[in-house]
């Protein structure tokens, strides 16, 4: 089975929820539920309210996503974001 094409969008964390979940407002003003990716948990990368993040969404459920990158002020992002 081939891996489906993931959508990557930029957003801002607006709320911290239980069980390491976050409410993220995307650039297009939609709000989704997001969780941190495994590598972010492994490397103990903190995500706080107000952080700019990169979220992967599957085309099958556009209400949930995986936070894959936290943008740092003054630095570039992955892949030219």
Swiss-Prot record:
InterPro entries: NA-bd_OB-fold, RNA-binding_domain_S1_IF1, S1_domain, TIF_IF1. PROSITE patterns: S1_IF1_TYPE (PS50832). Disulfide bonds: none annotated. Pfam families: eIF-1a. The keyword Cytoplasm applies. Its main location: cytoplasm. GO terms for molecular function: ribosome binding; rRNA binding; translation initiation factor activity. It is found in: Cytoplasm. Coiled coil: none annotated. Residues 1-72 form the S1-like domain. It comes from the Bacteria. Keywords: Cytoplasm, Initiation factor, Protein biosynthesis, RNA-binding, rRNA-binding. SUPFAM superfamilies: Nucleic acid-binding proteins (SSF50249). GO terms for cellular component: cytosol. HAMAP family: IF_1 (MF_00075). One of the essential components for the initiation of protein synthesis. Stabilizes the binding of IF-2 and IF-3 on the 30S subunit to which N-formylmethionyl-tRNA(fMet) subsequently binds. Helps modulate mRNA selection, yielding the 30S pre-initiation complex (PIC). Upon addition of the 50S ribosomal subunit IF-1, IF-2 and IF-3 are released leaving the mature 70S translation initiation complex. Component of the 30S ribosomal translation pre-initiation complex which assembles on the 30S ribosome in the order IF-2 and IF-3, IF-1 and N-formylmethionyl-tRNA(fMet); mRNA recruitment can occur at any time during PIC assembly. NCBIfam families: infA (TIGR00008). Belongs to the IF-1 family. This is Translation initiation factor IF-1 1. It comes from Novosphingobium aromaticivorans (strain ATCC 700278 / DSM 12444 / CCUG 56034 / CIP 105152 / NBRC 16084 / F199). The lineage of its organism: Bacteria, Pseudomonadati, Pseudomonadota, Alphaproteobacteria, Sphingomonadales. The gene is infA1.
